């Protein structure tokens, strides 16, 4: 998280540190907006942003028994989710950041040790977007899809296995029926199909095979 932390401007870093120590002294709505804005510009940051947001959510819940930061964060995520198709048309990088950030929040922030129910369908909808035939033609989107399924696939399947089945029917059909996929996309799709079929894990042999191929 240190590298993610230092990617922020000094004002936001200070707000974050203060929010974790004494959340009632910080404008938590302003802080959540700043974190979201930075996440939409910086892919490496938004991968770890969920952990940072979790620290603030925990501090606020324990020290003030409120949820201003979480509520505003979810409102912003909803806005970004609603605008996702326009975002994808405008900027592929920002679209990938939106998906990565939503999945990071889904991964880290829990309510009573369970994922936030309101995020389940938006996460699925984003992943379905990445599994469409035109998205499978874009290695950046395929890579994002596979990374997020490694990260939250098992948790997602536990919340709604039927939608996961539907998603993997799409991926399997893309792998088998789309003739113009790149060799890297085929490799990534084959890996994620095998990963889920093996119970969301890869044998050491399979891991070496796929990741030596990716490295090459």
Swiss-Prot record:
MF term (GO), any: translation activator activity
UniProt keyword ATP-binding present: no
Record localization: Cytoplasm; Nucleus
Highest taxon listed in the record's lineage: Eukaryota
UniProt-listed GO biological process terms: regulation of translational initiation
Major place of residence: cytoplasm
Keyword Nucleus part of the UniProt annotation: yes
A Pfam family this chain is assigned to: MIF4G
UniProt keyword list: Cytoplasm, Nucleus, Translation regulation
Domain MIF4G, residue spans: 2-199
GO cellular component terms given for this protein: cytosol; nucleus
Assembly mode: Interacts with eif4g1, eif4g2 and slbp; probably tethered by SLBP to the 3'-end of mRNAs ending with the histone stem-loop, it also interacts with eif4g1 which is bound to their 5'-end.
Function in brief: Functions in replication-dependent translation of histone mRNAs which differ from other eukaryotic mRNAs in that they do not end with a poly-A tail but a stem-loop. May participate in circularizing those mRNAs specifically enhancing their translation.
Family: Belongs to the MIF4GD family.
Protein's name according to its UniProt entry: MIF4G domain-containing protein A
Native source species: Danio rerio (Zebrafish)
Phylogenetic lineage: Eukaryota, Metazoa, Chordata, Craniata, Vertebrata
């Amino acid at each position: 998280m240190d590298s993610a932390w230092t990617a922020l401007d000094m004002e936001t870093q200070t707000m974050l540190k203060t929010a974790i120590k004494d959340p009632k002294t910080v404008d938590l709505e302003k802080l959540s907006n700043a974190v979201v804005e930075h996440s939409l510009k910086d892919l490496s940051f938004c991968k770890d942003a969920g952990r940072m947001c979790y620290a603030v959510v925990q501090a606020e819940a324990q020290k003030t028994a409120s949820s201003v930061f979480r509520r505003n964060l979810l409102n912003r995520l909803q806005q970004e989710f609603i605008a996702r198709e326009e975002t994808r048309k405008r900027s592929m990088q920002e679209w990938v950041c939106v998906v990565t950030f939503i999945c990071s929040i889904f991964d880290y922030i829990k309510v009573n040790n369970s994922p936030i129910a309101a995020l389940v369908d938006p996460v699925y909808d984003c992943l379905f977007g990445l599994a469409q035939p035109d998205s499978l033609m874009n290695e950046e989107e395929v890579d994002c899809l596979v990374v997020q399924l490694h990260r939250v696939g098992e948790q997602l399947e536990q919340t709604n296995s039927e939608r996961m089945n539907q998603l993997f029917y799409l991926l399997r059909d893309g792998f088998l029926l789309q003739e113009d996929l790149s060799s890297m996309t085929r490799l990534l799709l084959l890996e994620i199909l095998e990963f889920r079929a093996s119970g969301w894990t890869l044998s050491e042999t399979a891991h070496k095979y796929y990741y030596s191929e990716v490295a090459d």
